[in-house]
Amino acid sequence: MRVIVFVKATDDSEKGILPTTELLEAMGKFNEELINAGIMRVGDGLKPSSQGKRIAFDGPGRTVIDGPFAETRELVAGFWLWEVKDMDEAVAWVKRCPNPMPGPSEIEIRPLYEMADFQ
């Protein structure tokens, strides 16, 4: 099964505060483990929402909304796309992950729809 793994944003990540060298090294090693295990398909960090835009759809209308976006808890600071046997395997890998932020942080795992889900 494929899952997307979201690293949730924090006040620091929204301020553009970059990870420490130690954290970058630890995450690099973790990513290497994921790749060597055949789990990781892609992954990257995101710049703060102040550098992003949202497009709001309402029927035929489109409205562009400039960042930053208010609800930091709902924002994403990074992501991975993984191929795992099941959700339990994804959870086990996330538990091995270095804390992605200084201080409290949160990682969310969401399964992707597969073609079989639509049949």
Residue ranges and their predicted role:
Residues 1-119:
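Conserved, structured core segments of small domains
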